Amino acid sequence: MSRVCQVSGKRVQTGNNVSHANNKTRRRFLPNLHERRFWVASENRWVKLRVSAHALRTIDKNGIDSVLAELRARGEKV
């Protein structure tokens, strides 16, 4: 399973660890992903999504129904 948020599209980024001596080694910045269930009252069912913390705030702000509508418009199976 890929480390990509289903709502916001956040994914793994790459960069450097930088030591005190300014030595650089490659590293990955992982998104803060959580597998969460959301109750969709209009469909009378639970929907399981893999979302980032940023996407959780978006769902709180806009509502799960509008977020699911955007996902379906993108062609994602929910």
Swiss-Prot record:
<keyword id="KW-0689">Ribosomal protein</keyword>
<dbReference type="InterPro" id="IPR037147">
    <property type="entry name" value="Ribosomal_bL28_sf"/>
</dbReference>
<protein>
    <recommendedName>
        <fullName>Large ribosomal subunit protein bL28</fullName>
    </recommendedName>
</protein>
<feature type="region of interest" description="Disordered">
    <location>
        <begin position="1"/>
        <end position="23"/>
    </location>
</feature>
<comment type="similarity">
    <text>Belongs to the bacterial ribosomal protein bL28 family.</text>
</comment>
<dbReference type="GO" id="GO:0003735">
    <property type="term" value="F:structural constituent of ribosome"/>
</dbReference>
<feature type="compositionally biased region" description="Polar residues">
    <location>
        <begin position="11"/>
        <end position="22"/>
    </location>
</feature>
<dbReference type="Pfam" id="PF00830">
    <property type="entry name" value="Ribosomal_L28"/>
</dbReference>
<dbReference type="GO" id="GO:0006412">
    <property type="term" value="P:translation"/>
</dbReference>
<dbReference type="InterPro" id="IPR026569">
    <property type="entry name" value="Ribosomal_bL28"/>
</dbReference>
<dbReference type="InterPro" id="IPR034704">
    <property type="entry name" value="Ribosomal_bL28/bL31-like_sf"/>
</dbReference>
<keyword id="KW-0687">Ribonucleoprotein</keyword>
<dbReference type="InterPro" id="IPR001383">
    <property type="entry name" value="Ribosomal_bL28_bact-type"/>
</dbReference>
<dbReference type="GO" id="GO:0022625">
    <property type="term" value="C:cytosolic large ribosomal subunit"/>
</dbReference>
